[in-house]
């Protein structure tokens, strides 16, 4: 009976190092955002993390931020959840005048919007950075690429300055 217990313990101890081989290898990629709408994106999260602030209409949100973690190898079931908030609006009174409290305008924050979207196929050669694209009608796309959104071969194309603006 004791020999069986010893055999089970030895088997478990031998298998533990192998379990590390079964873990999916991941990589941390810097991320950025491109806004294809005419509204500000004040903040966004990727899978509940992040907090990049102020992605301007029809433009990018400045430098890249570290990091979003992805598997080194793409799989067809990959999805990410993007949650974002618009820039808000200044509170106005019944006459349309901006409300001032304590000497400051009052900002009414936009509600948070959340979408879970597929991650398009990528290869090891694409593992440069992760870009979130805010599209019209509260849609969002993501992309893993070594190209930056301003590159002529990058799709979706970087917004042209002044496009869709009043």
Which residues fall in each region the model found?
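C-terminal motif of bacterial Sec signal peptides marking the signal peptidase cleavage site
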Residues: 16-20
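Short coil/turn motif common to extracellular beta-sandwich-like domains
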Residues: 26-30
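Tryptophan-paired
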Residues: 44-91
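Beta-strand-rich cores of mature extracytoplasmic or soluble domains
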Residues: 84-166
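Asparagine-centered strand-capping/turn motif at beta-strand->loop junctions
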Residues: 34-35
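Bacterial N-terminal signal peptides that target proteins for export
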Residues: 1-9
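Bacterial signal peptide processing site
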Residues: 22-24
